[in-house]
Amino acid sequence: MSKTIAINAGSSSLKWQLYQMPNEEVIAKGIVERIGLKDSIFTIKYGEGQKYEVIVDIDNHEVAVKMLLDQLIDLNILGSYDEITGVGHRVVAGGEEFKDSVVITDEVLEKIEALSELAPLHNPANAMGIKAFKHILPEIISVAVFDTSFHTTMPEHNYLYSVPREYYEKFAARKYGAHGTSHRYVSQRAAEMLGRPIEDLKIITCHLGNGASITAVDGGKSVDTSMGFTPLAGVTMGTRSGDVDASLLPYLMTKLGLTDVQDMVDILNKKSGLLGLTNGLSSDMRDIQSNLDKPEVQTAYNIFIDRIRKYIGSYVTVMNGVDAIVFTAGIGENAVGVRKDIIDGMTWFGCEIDDDKNNVHGEEAVISTDDSKIKLLLVPTDEELMIARDVERLK
């Protein structure tokens, strides 16, 4: 049996999971943090609750990869490098170019780097991870799995913005979405849990974490999603504003004395959302829920819930119906009250949540009542498994 490693490389981190394929068993997983900084943190979890952790300076991603592979051998998790038969890499932006996962060639890598303008915080880091593994394991197949690929099935009327069409034709200015690998996994898993072909289902998937997005999945294909040209659009998030009137930017820039539009975008990305609405209290939903006695925190919570309901309601219209609503990611999987508050405001189209079934954290469950016309599901996301599956598919 082959071993496949799924990689999520950040600018100063490397998150990974090692799978025994094709039986999809997680052999080990871990993260390298603070790459390029002093006191990098190197962690491997394996076996029956065993953990290896060391703090050491790690200069770059290639050093991190070499250290990871050597330590997997030292811990007898790998016998040699040769046991790894595939490496899958998360890549945030694939633009219109990549409609599916793809084997990474030099040409593909160049295109990934060229698409960095669509994801300047992510694609360059993803490319660093790819280069590091290809240098150390040059003969092993590498596969890029794009966050945006799942959304390339959106019809034109759902991905175009109402600006001059030439901006799309010249500059590819359009909605791309994000979290596609997560939405793909949980929609497929929901269909399996319901025992119905995904081709026959209309599903709304709610990926609710510090970043959050809602997707309409019709017959297994994404037909609309809340994130846009970048992951800044859509619902209210931990630190991101979600949808705002574009005219707000120049107005606030004038009031704040800003001259660089990127400074304003940074505020919308990093200082807004729940964090901004609570005057800097927190971007963490757990902190929000424990401070609902504060009026501004209650309002922030209400806005968070309201925006999600609005997107769900609009996607019922987009698909002319819905069979199931799925909750996933950190908030979606663990915040019992958030799920209840979202659904309690949407009983008008046949959603009924079962309070006992909903009292669950981080595990698969059908949480709707037996009489609910719309099935409600909790499905923990597993983007790493989807990456490993795509590597197997493309070998």
Curated annotation (Swiss-Prot):
It holds the Pfam family Acetate_kinase. SUPFAM superfamilies: Actin-like ATPase domain. One of its GO terms (cellular component) is cytoplasm. PROSITE patterns: ACETATE_KINASE_1 (PS01075), ACETATE_KINASE_2 (PS01076). Coiled coil: none annotated. It is an enzyme of class 2 (transferase). The keyword Chaperone does not apply. The record marks H179, R240 as: Transition state stabilizer. It catalyses: acetate + ATP = acetyl phosphate + ADP. It is found in: Cytoplasm. Its cofactor is Mg(2+); Mn(2+). One of its GO terms (biological process) is acetate metabolic process. Its EC number is 2.7.2.1. InterPro entries: Ac/propionate_kinase (IPR004372), Aliphatic_acid_kin_short-chain (IPR000890), Aliphatic_acid_kinase_CS (IPR023865), ATPase_NBD (IPR043129). CDD domains: ASKHA_NBD_AcK_PK (cd24010). The active site is at D147 (proton donor/acceptor). Homodimer. Catalyzes the formation of acetyl phosphate from acetate and ATP. Can also catalyze the reverse reaction. Belongs to the acetokinase family. This is Acetate kinase.
